[in-house]
Amino acid sequence: MQCRRQVRMCWPLLGTALLLLLPGPPLSCAQNVSEYQVKAAYLYNFSKFVEWPAQAFASPVAPIRLCVLKEQAFESELNQVVKGKMVGGRAVTVVPVQTAEQSLGCQILFIASSQDKQSRQIIDTLRNTSVLTVGESEGFLERGGIINFVLQDDRVQLQVNHKAATQAGLHISSRLLSVAKLVIQ
């Protein structure tokens, strides 16, 4: 009798566990996923598909620094994505920056469209460094930026300036290049 009672008590728990295992809606259908959440996930994943020269880091165990230029809302979104994550044995950290000079120790720098007027000067300052510059504005690649986010049909798409990446000493994985909507050789 006691066994039956225990089994009956387990059914609700088993049912709940099975519901949790069912797949949810695809990411593209999820209404609560913001554009910045998608871009933050991309930035984190760039750290997995881009190789930097050894001199781009202060030491062999230095973290991968994802820097955000003057954009607190995006910075907090990115912090949520990378919290506690490691890539290639390195911790991933988010660093707010205010100037191009502060970006010199970064591996990735995100320049929001709100900072578009500064982007040319920042890209010029970082041109001969191994900083992966990522933007979200028209003409970003033409100014020498390396990766640009564009919205098309409510989807975040990538454009890549492979030539600028090579000049910066960065190696972008063919897997990342294959998902780009546009690649400038």
PLM region spans:
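Short hydrophobic alpha-helices and adjacent helix-cap/hinge residues
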Residues: Q2-Q185
